[in-house]
């Protein structure tokens, strides 16, 4: 089913397998495969239209993250847990980047408080992600836009103390 891109049916079959056989030797693989299929599902739906997966609906990314997390939680010593951990890092970066794009959208539309809150969310919930620096930079810009100079300077201080060679890799369309 997976190879024929029948993702939903494959996930349902894996859910049934996991429920029926919660602790046999192949169960960790079922957890892993469920995460892989969900990750693939999130990537394939809009690949030809939007190349950056963070700009799409990220529900499947959230689901894949949950499935890999469950695998690691239930079977920490499984041979699939190490690979699942690597996938969690990638998925977290996608989720953080998605939040950044939402903050950027708010900035573009003049919703500066909403953009600041999204930037804070990135920093608090995805502290080791690749989007933290952009989030801090965007936060400073939005604080400037509402004349909160001290808060803008605080954000810049943290940004350049943490990322001394930072250069923005995004553009605000106004």
Predicted regions: what is each one?
Residues 1-174:
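Acidic, polar-rich low-complexity tracts and alpha-helical solenoid repeat scaffolds
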